[in-house]
Amino acid sequence: MPRLEESEIKKYWQIFQGLKPENNKVSGEQVSPVLKNSRLPQQQLASVWTLSDIDNDGKLDFEEFCITMRLIFDLINGSISEVPLQLPLWLIPSSKAALIQANQAVNLGRNLGIDYDDDDDGLTDDFDWYISPADKSTYETIYQLKNDRFGRIRFDSLESLYATLRNVPKSEISSAWNLVNPKSFETIDKDQTIVFLHILNQRENGKRIPRGVPASLRATFSKEIPNYNLDAQVKPQHTTQTQASKRSFAEDYLTKLGHNGKSLFSLLAPLSSGNDRGTDFSATQGTDWEEVRLRRELTDLENLLEKIQNRSDKDKKDDEEQRMVKYEFEQLLKYKQEQYDRQQREREVEGSGGSGLKQVEK
């Protein structure tokens, strides 16, 4: 059978829009008149729907609708006599290839009588959604190496990473991809990539992949422009992985790529050494020393940002990398400034009187 032609897709688009889709999807009730007009047997129509509804949500997006229409036309025209057991490769949307692959793997396991009892797979249920700074740095390094010019990541762009995972079957890699990509787009952004890699990391270390994601992440992944905020994740009081296992994720992979697991922040080591480190007032948090500490951090960050800018002017070869480092420090500086301003407002509400530490600061 030939591939879908552009004129054919345009025709399906007109029909799809005529059904007045909601959230870019049409329900069975909306599609029912179109299906019944084909005068095909009810059993065949049901099989077409089952085959086309790839994500099993009871609705069809435009790609799934195109599959439905093409199968119906082929049945009517006699190009095929029966609904195929699975979609031909030429009819599979690239954005849903990973999902179909995962579904086929599960179905194959059922047909072979493979036991998927969670209690017997040797995995634990203590999956941890918290992403430590060290892990996040590793994930960001992989993202920087593999994203395209639009800042997006394709599923197959990480094939070389998948090959280094000894304990993660291909079907579970696809499942992890689908968790962070509920809209089945062909690519995912940085925020989704970080969580995707974290899921693979946890699974590689013996943690069972959850069946869903937290509500906050689910809402984030459903947006066109996610608002991923690591600070919103609550750090647990216990660690579920050893430090050695955390360091091991993607270490071989990054070594092959010549990065040896280093993050972008490793570039700042020469800039933040010596006298630029400042005094650590972390033990005094919650006292008036917190104000002194914040003011010192703001000053240090401003000085460090200035050095980064001067370095960028002198060395244009690392322009893209410098921009990323600069952006990350600008965001950190903004956060610290807001934290300091908020503390100042709270002090104004509480009123003055007391500590005498402002005299020390002066």
Swiss-Prot record:
Write down the CDD domains for this protein, in alphabetical order: EH
Its membrane topology is listed as: Peripheral membrane protein
Q: Taxonomic classification, please?
A: Eukaryota, Fungi, Dikarya, Ascomycota, Saccharomycotina
What are the subcellular locations of this protein? Answer: Cell membrane; Endosome membrane; Cytoplasm, Cytoskeleton, Actin patch
Query: What protein family does this chain belong to?
Result: Belongs to the END3 family.
Q: Domain (EF-hand): give its ranges.
A: 40-75
Function, as annotated, reads: Component of the PAN1 actin cytoskeleton-regulatory complex required for the internalization of endosomes during actin-coupled endocytosis. The complex links the site of endocytosis to the cell membrane-associated actin cytoskeleton. Mediates uptake of external molecules and vacuolar degradation of plasma membrane proteins. Plays a role in the proper organization of the cell membrane-associated actin cytoskeleton and promotes its destabilization.
Task: Read off the SMART domains from this record.
Answer: EFh, EH
Membrane among keywords = yes
One annotated GO molecular function: actin binding
Does the record's keyword annotation contain Mitochondrion? no
Give the record's keywords alphabetically.
Answer: Actin-binding, Calcium, Cell membrane, Coiled coil, Cytoplasm, Cytoskeleton, Endocytosis, Endosome, Membrane, Metal-binding, Repeat
Bilayer-spanning residue ranges: none
The EH domain is annotated at 8-98, 135-224
Q: Compositional bias of type Basic and acidic residues: which residue ranges?
A: 339-350
Coiled-coil positions: 287-348
Where are the residues of the annotated region Disordered?
339-362
- What residues bind Ca(2+), as annotated? D53, D55, D57, K59, E64
Q: Could you name the Gene Ontology cellular component terms for this entry?
A: actin cortical patch; actin cytoskeleton-regulatory complex; endosome membrane; plasma membrane
Q: What is this protein called?
A: Actin cytoskeleton-regulatory complex protein END3
